[in-house]
Amino acid sequence: TFAMFAAGRAYEQIRNSVAYPHFNVKICATHAGVSVGEDGGSHQCIEDLALMRVIPGMTVLCPADANEAKAATMAIADFDGPVYMRLARLATPVFEGDMVKPFVLGKANVLREGKDVAIFATGLMVNESLMAAEALAKDGIDAAVINVHTIKPIDAECVTAWAEKCGKVITVEEHSVIGGLGDAVADVLMGKVNCKFHKIGVNDQFGQSGKAADVLREYGLTADQIAATIKANI
């Protein structure tokens, strides 16, 4: 069902009847983020990663494409414990060739190497970040792109290594900048790595109705806008 209902309406049941007794329940929520489009702010869940991430013992996933969603489904079927998996409504390009990486719970995948800035992205924003990195390359900025499909437990080793290597970190998510991927990455780096850091996502506001592409642009979540924001913050 919609992430708004799975994570929002059912929150108390998930907390007390699934996570508290640590039952082996998998919650697969679709239509997440502002790319839901015309259904508007009431149905555009931009808080679900934060809500699920804070629940003790909950594993939180956000696949980047159809193949990764399939691999994640198989992985969580074999995993014993509560899991929340976030899926988008919008059609997403399917990665091919070298972009197809093994799916391992809790292990981020480096899709593009770089030395100037490390872009940590999740879900729909992984492809947008790859396109943003291509645009940045034309301006002489060598950006690494890391697909963080597992928000919790986050791959702290990968986050730390790339933050140290690049010295500049950007997080990109189709979610509130409060409590999601950006905060998960910040939690890893705080007090450990001295680097520039900026979160790209939906600021402290609700979504709104419109064509998915238009709404994504309204919140600065298209490839060209991501590239521009990165240039302004590194």
Q: Where do the language-model regions lie?
A:
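Thiamine diphosphate
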Residues: 36-37, 88-234
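Conserved thiamine diphosphate
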Residues: 1-113, 117-118
